[in-house]
């Protein structure tokens, strides 16, 4: 199934996919230890750290292809990036290795994508650049989203991002007719119609062609 590997402010994302509601949000805020009320971690994680459960209560695997999956968020900025790469690589293995096609509770023959989220300030971290380069080399279905609000806490991006735009800085990663690479999109966060159209196109390319998309 599709997996998210994100950072610790994706409550809107999780609510949009139906994996978080208001009651669970406040249960996590007050560290509720009952997983019926706080399924992400039973109160063990900090606020804003989300995940979904891959196992049933009896320890058996859930069918991950029938649900929206999220790996557990962590606090170190850009720490989600190496895991994102691994999730995308797993999908490629499931597509290319016929011996794995029988594991239908995990993958539909590699028809999955790994969805990453990160803030623009954290793109200055080394783990971001290492992962982006590796995904381009490996050509894995990784859909990378950078939330660009212009600041990292209180530091404007002109002091931390070349050209003040991560998509501009990564233009050399754009694929062409002769060389493999990324498909890169840039869209205004306030333009909802354009967002829907861009994400539909980006996800379709990532899933069908099994290439990384920014």
Language model regions located:
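Cofactor-binding active-site loop characterized by glycine-rich and histidine/acidic residues
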Residues: 1-140, 145, 156-174, 179
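Thiamine diphosphate
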Residues: 142-214
């Amino acid at each position: 199934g599709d997996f998210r590997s994100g950072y610790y402010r994706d409550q809107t994302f999780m609510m949009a996919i139906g994996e978080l509601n208001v009651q669970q949000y406040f249960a996590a805020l007050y560290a509720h230890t009952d997983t019926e009320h706080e399924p992400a971690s039973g109160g063990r994680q900090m606020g804003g750290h989300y995940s979904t459960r891959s196992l049933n209560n009896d320890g058996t695997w859930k069918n991950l292809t029938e649900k929206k999956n999220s790996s557990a968020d962590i606090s170190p900025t850009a720490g989600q990036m190496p895991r994102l790469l691994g999730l995308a690589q797993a999908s490629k293995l499931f597509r290319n290795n016929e011996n794995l096609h029988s594991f239908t509770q995990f993958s539909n023959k590699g028809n999955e994508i790994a969805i990453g989220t990160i803030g623009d300030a954290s793109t200055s971290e080394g783990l971001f650049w290492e992962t982006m380069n590796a995904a381009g080399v490996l050509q894995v279905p990784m859909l990378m989203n950078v939330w660009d609000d212009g600041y990292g806490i209180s530091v404007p991006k002109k002091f931390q991002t070349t050209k003040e735009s991560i998509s501009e800085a990564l233009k050399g990663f754009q694929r062409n007719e002769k060389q493999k690479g990324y498909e890169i999109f840039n869209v205004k966060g306030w333009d909802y119609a354009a967002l829907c159209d861009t994400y539909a196109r980006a996800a379709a390319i990532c899933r069908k062609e099994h290439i990384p998309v920014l």
